[in-house]
């Protein structure tokens, strides 16, 4: 295995010191270091590289993030496909904008408090034990709420992403090949993420639910791409018109049901208050039987008696 040292950087960076310039002075000027796929398993003290802004260390054997406290100007850090199990020792990287940690052994997204400039976080394809899923530390989510714009959490056995509602400036979410199941949970999240214009959920069970795409388009006005497919204005307008028509029918049916209930109630009350009784009265020919309510048994004329007709 190989350790990343200043000497290794000096020997492999094609440094060309000017006259009377030392190697140390050259190292201070370095802004980019690329040691990807070099069997590196540890990072030594690189404090001389104070102007380092981009560090490529992907496809190595690094198990622990160390000795980066000096890199206060670092904006891009590539550590994907290593052996890292814990996100740590990054809080001094105040200017960090992009962090790539995919393909490691990370079980909890944590330790990112204080990284107020972090805009992209890539933690896809973690090599987790069977049955485990990637989790989010609420403290880290709160810390990234204002800054994070792009998040990749694909293939991590995740079954719930409602906690991501805190990421109010998130505009791209890639969460393919997880275990998301409920459309209602996604509707809740999209209602919160008002700036989200791209979401990819391919490979989740929820994608097979009836009206899955229609429901997500209807709930989010900002969404432009869903599962890699553009949402055209004509598609959204059609769904909005369909929903408006459906809602109008529901309201009409509800009103009709209320009117019917009121009518039935009135009839029932009338029958209860005024009992129907039979009345016999003499008539030429065969006697007839008439039915009147109690309030109809007597004529309006007070001078007439019931037997006078």
UniProtKB/Swiss-Prot annotation:
**What post-translational modification does the entry describe?**
Phosphorylated; in the testis.
Q: Which PROSITE patterns match?
A: LRR
GO molecular function annotation: actin binding; dynein complex binding; tubulin binding
Mind telling me which GO cellular component terms the entry cites? centrosome; cytoplasm; manchette; microtubule cytoskeleton; microtubule organizing center
Q: What is its main location?
A: cytoplasm
Which spans of this chain does UniProt mark as LRR repeats?
Answer: 29-50, 51-72, 73-94, 95-116, 117-138, 147-168, 169-190
Task: Report the locations given in the UniProt record.
Answer: Cytoplasm, Cytoskeleton; Cytoplasm, Cytoskeleton, Microtubule organizing center, Centrosome
> SMART domains, per this entry?
LRR_SD22 (SM00365)
Q: Which UniProt keywords apply?
A: Cytoplasm, Cytoskeleton, Leucine-rich repeat, Repeat
Cite the LRRCT domain residue spans from the record: 204-242
**Record InterPro entries:** Leu-rich_rpt, Leu-rich_rpt_4, LRR_dom_sf, SDS22/Internalin_LRR
Query: What SUPFAM superfamilies does its record include?
Result: L domain-like
What does the record give as the function of this protein?
Regulates phosphatase activity of protein phosphatase 1 (PP1) complexes in the testis.
Subunit structure as annotated in this protein's UniProt entry: Interacts with PPP1CC isoform gamma-2; the interaction is direct. Interacts with actin, dynein, KIF5B, KIFC1 and tubulin. Associates with microtubules.
Task: Report the PANTHER family cross-referenced here.
Answer: LEUCINE-RICH REPEAT AND IQ DOMAIN-CONTAINING PROTEIN 1-RELATED (PTHR46652), LEUCINE-RICH REPEAT-CONTAINING PROTEIN 9 (PTHR46652:SF3)
Any idea what this protein is called? Protein phosphatase 1 regulatory subunit 42
**Organism of this sequence:** Homo sapiens (Human)
């Amino acid at each position: 295995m190989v350790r990343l040292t200043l000497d290794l950087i000096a020997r492999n960076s094609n440094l060309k010191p000017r006259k009377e310039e030392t190697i140390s002075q050259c190292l201070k000027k370095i802004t980019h270091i690329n040691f990807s796929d070099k069997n590196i398993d540890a990072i030594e003290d690189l404090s001389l590289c104070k102007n380092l802004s981009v560090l490529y260390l992907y496809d190595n054997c690094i198990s622990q993030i160390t000795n980066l406290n000096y890199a206060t100007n670092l904006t891009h850090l590539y550590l994907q496909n290593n052996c890292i199990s814990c996100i740590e020792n990054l809080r001094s990287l105040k200017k960090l904008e992009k962090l790539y940690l995919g393909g490691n052994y990370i079980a909890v997204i944590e330790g990112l408090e204080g990284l107020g400039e972090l805009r992209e976080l890539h933690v896809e394809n973690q090599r987790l034990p069977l049955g485990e899923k990637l989790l989010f530390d609420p403290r880290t989510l709160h810390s990234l709420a204002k800054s994070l714009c792009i998040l990749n959490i694909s293939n991590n056995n995740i079954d719930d992403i409602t906690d991501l509602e805190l990421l109010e400036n998130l505009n791209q979410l890639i969460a393919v090949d997880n275990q998301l199941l409920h459309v209602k949970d996604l509707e809740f999240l999209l209602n919160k993420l008002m700036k989200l214009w791209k979401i990819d959920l391919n490979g989740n069970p929820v994608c097979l639910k009836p009206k899955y795409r229609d429901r997500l388009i209807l709930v989010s006005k900002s969404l432009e791409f869903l599962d890699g497919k553009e949402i055209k204005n004509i598609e959204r307008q059609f769904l909005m018109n369909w929903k408006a028509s459906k809602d109008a029918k529901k309201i009409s049916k509800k009103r009709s049901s209320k009117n019917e209930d009121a009518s039935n109630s009135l009839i029932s009350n009338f029958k209860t208050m005024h009992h129907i009784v039979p009345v016999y009265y003499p008539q030429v020919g065969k006697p007839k039987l008439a039915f009147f309510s109690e309030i109809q048994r007597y004529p309006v004329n007070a001078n007439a008696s019931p037997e006078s007709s």
